[in-house]
Amino acid sequence: MAATRWAAPSCELRDSKDMTLEQICAWLIDRASKHEVVIRLQTGDPSLYGALIEMVQPLDAAGVPVRVVPGVTSGMASAAAAVESLTLPEVTQTVIFTRVAGRTPMPAGEDLRELAAHHCTLCIYLSITLLHKVQADLRAAG
C-alpha cells in the first residue's frame, strides 16, 4: 500500500491480507492494550464493503476507542481518474453502489437486474471474477 511509505521507521507494519478478521482484531486489541497508537489502514472507504461493524464490535467490547477516517472508494477514484462524472443533468442524478451475489448472497430486491432497471449509474464492486454474470444481468435489464 503506497500510504505506508510515509510511516516512520519506528512503526510496526503488518500486512493483514492473509489474516482473518478475528486475527486482525486480536492484534489491534493486543497493541492497544499496550497503549500503542494503532492504525488500521484499508483501501477505499472502510464504511463500504470494509467489514467496519464486524471490526468495531470486538474493539468496543475490549474498550479500545475507535475513530474512522473516510477514504475514497474506487468508484469515485475511477471517475476522477477518467475525468468523468457519475451523474449527468437530465440523464441520471442517481448512483448505486452494489455488488453481485458471490460468497455473500444479496438481499431480496437487490439483484443486479433489478437495480439496472433504474437506468442510473451503477458502481459495481467485488465482482471481477463474476464479469460474465455482470454482463448477462446488465444485458437482461436492457
PLM feature spans:
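Class I S-adenosyl-L-methionine
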Residues: 1-72, 77
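Generic beta-sheet signal
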Residues: 36-40, 95, 120-124
